[in-house]
């Protein structure tokens, strides 16, 4: 079976971890293809156990699945080992986790530069997580990065880190007045860490393509969301990689024709963390309600997420940019007990109406949402397991979102648990 891509269709935090966990039992492989530990996935098992993952694919919680950290990911060795230890301490088998030899390593100087740069920028800062993700991707593009495979050759590794530190220490000391990092200490720490994960390093491209040739199912799991994509997002308030569907092939080493389904994960309302324009953002009691009822606290940052009504403009944009075939709508249960539920169907910018994403961030920042008021429902829907179990007004809301987004809503989340899901059609169905 060809590959299936899971895409965040908004600004991240849509519930991708739950979806990967739900579908993982039907896949042989789960691959993380971009980002680093700047994003978090929360998975609630049927037992009620709650797991938070930042770097390791969500499929690690499903027995029998091989999990891959792909070449498009930037790997913080300390975070990797800490996350592995945390899983193993709770009885999770991590033996089937593999790491691409071509993934880049996130180094101490990346974190140091990221943090000091954000402080230096003041009120002009992007709002990064401060975990060094951007600087690591900068080094990758500048061809001065350290790759996972480099730890297999300590001599060559030392030369590469030495060359990098000659420049990084100049930046830290002469520009930011910070202390220089010690070469020997950086190398020694990394080699000690590498002893604990070097057995996982392999040519994951070869393995994934062989698996697809054998008819196995591969889930490609993105981090963040479409509007945080460095090319297609609300630049410059974006991440440093490509969470969109195009990045899935690039960050895993499979060809784009291998992709069978693009499943967009869409929250029933909209949230965002950090700086940047957000047309439907709420600053009233409705925003407070969504944040409290939806437990909208960032898994990685601990920051409260900004909350707003559903924005069909960005949903249509995500459908177009990713070629989304199906949607998984999450957190519909959060909207219960609202008298009306507004949906943004377009923007008004300088007196002109549009139903498409503006091409400049200044236009998006001053966009006034055009709302369509939909009737709310009061019933508790957390126990619904069939579409017909939902109140009529909740069904109407889903169908209207489906129409506006431009792709069918195949599944609906009505709670955080794996079993709190309504399946309208099989997203892994054959399309031939």
Swiss-Prot record:
As for family, the record states: Belongs to the adenylosuccinate synthetase family.
Q: What does this protein do?
A: Plays an important role in the de novo pathway of purine nucleotide biosynthesis. Catalyzes the first committed step in the biosynthesis of AMP from IMP.
Q: What class of enzyme is it?
A: ligase
Q: What assembly does the database describe for this protein?
A: Homodimer.
Write the Enzyme Commission number(s) for this entry: 6.3.4.4
Which reaction(s) does its UniProt entry say it catalyses? Answer: IMP + L-aspartate + GTP = N(6)-(1,2-dicarboxyethyl)-AMP + GDP + phosphate + 2 H(+)
Q: Name one GO biological process term.
A: 'de novo' AMP biosynthetic process
Compartments where located: Cytoplasm
UniProt xrefs under HAMAP family = Adenylosucc_synth
Does the UniProt entry include the keyword Transit peptide?
no
Q: Extract the SUPFAM superfamilies matched here.
A: P-loop containing nucleoside triphosphate hydrolases (SSF52540)
Instruction: Indicate which residues the UniProt annotation says bind Mg(2+).
Output: 13, 40
Name the residues annotated as catalytic in the UniProt entry.
13 (proton acceptor), 41 (proton donor)
Q: In what pathway does it function? A: Purine metabolism; AMP biosynthesis via de novo pathway; AMP from IMP: step 1/2
Q: Which NCBIfam families does the record cross-reference, listed alphabetically?
A: PRK01117.1, purA
Q: Which cofactor does it need?
A: Mg(2+)
Where does this protein come from, organism-wise?
Mycobacterium leprae (strain TN)
Q: Which UniProt keywords apply?
A: Cytoplasm, GTP-binding, Ligase, Magnesium, Metal-binding, Nucleotide-binding, Purine biosynthesis
In which residues is substrate bound? 299-305
Residue sites binding IMP per the record: 13-16, 38-41, 129, 143, 224, 239, 303
Quick one: a GO cellular component term? Answer: cytoplasm
The protein depicted here goes by the name Adenylosuccinate synthetase
Paste the cofactor note.
Binds 1 Mg(2+) ion per subunit.
Q: Which residues bind GTP?
A: 12-18, 40-42, 305, 331-333, 413-415
Q: Name one GO molecular function term.
A: magnesium ion binding
């Amino acid at each position: 079976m060809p590959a299936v891509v899971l895409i965040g269709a908004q600004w991240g935090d849509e519930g991708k971890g739950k979806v990967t966990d739900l579908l993982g039992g039907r896949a042989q492989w789960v691959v993380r293809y971009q980002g680093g530990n700047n994003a978090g996935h929360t998975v609630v098992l049927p037992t009620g156990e709650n797991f938070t993952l930042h770097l390791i694919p969500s499929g690690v919680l499903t027995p029998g699945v091989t999990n891959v950290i792909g070449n498009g990911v930037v790997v913080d060795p300390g975070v990797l080992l800490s996350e592995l230890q945390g899983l193993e301490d709770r009885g999770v088998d991590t033996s089937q986790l593999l790491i691409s030899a071509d993934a880049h390593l996130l180094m101490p100087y990346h974190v140091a530069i990221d943090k000091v740069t954000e402080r230096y920028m003041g009120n002009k800062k992007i709002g990064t997580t401060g975990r060094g993700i951007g600087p690591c991707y900068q080094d990758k593009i500048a061809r001065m990065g350290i790759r996972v495979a480099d730890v297999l050759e300590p001599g060559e590794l030392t030369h590469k880190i030495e060359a990098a530190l000659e420049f990084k220490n100049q930046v830290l000391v002469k520009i930011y007045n910070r202390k220089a990092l010690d070469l020997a200490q950086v190398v020694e720490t990394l080699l000690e860490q590498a002893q604990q994960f070097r057995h996982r390093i392999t040519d994951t491209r070869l393995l994934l393509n062989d698996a697809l040739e054998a008819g196995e199912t591969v889930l490609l799991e993105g981090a963040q969301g479409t509007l945080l994509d460095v090319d297609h997002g609300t630049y410059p308030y974006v991440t440093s990689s490509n969470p969109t569907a195009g990045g899935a092939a690039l960050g895993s080493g499979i060809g784009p024709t291998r992709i069978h389904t693009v499943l967009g994960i869409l929250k029933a309302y909209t949230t965002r963390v950090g700086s940047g324009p957000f047309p439907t953002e709420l600053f009233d009691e409705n925003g407070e309600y969504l944040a409290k009822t939806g437990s909208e606290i960032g898994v990685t940052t601990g920051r409260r997420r900004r909350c707003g009504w559903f924005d069909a403009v960005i949903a249509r944009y995500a459908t177009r940019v990713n070629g989304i075939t199906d949607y998984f709508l999450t957190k519909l249960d959060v909207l219960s007990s609202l008298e009306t539920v507004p949906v943004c169907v377009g923007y008004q910018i300088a007196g002109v109406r549009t139903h498409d994403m503006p091409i400049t961030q200044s236009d998006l920042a001053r966009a006034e949402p055009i709302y369509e008021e939909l009737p709310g429902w009061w019933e508790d829907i957390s126990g619904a397991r069939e579409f017909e179990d939902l109140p009529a007004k909740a069904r109407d809301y889903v169908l209207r979102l489906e129409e506006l987004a431009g792709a069918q809503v195949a599944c609906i989340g009505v709670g955080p648990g794996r079993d709190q899901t309504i399946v309208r059609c099989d997203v892994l169905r054959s399309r031939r």
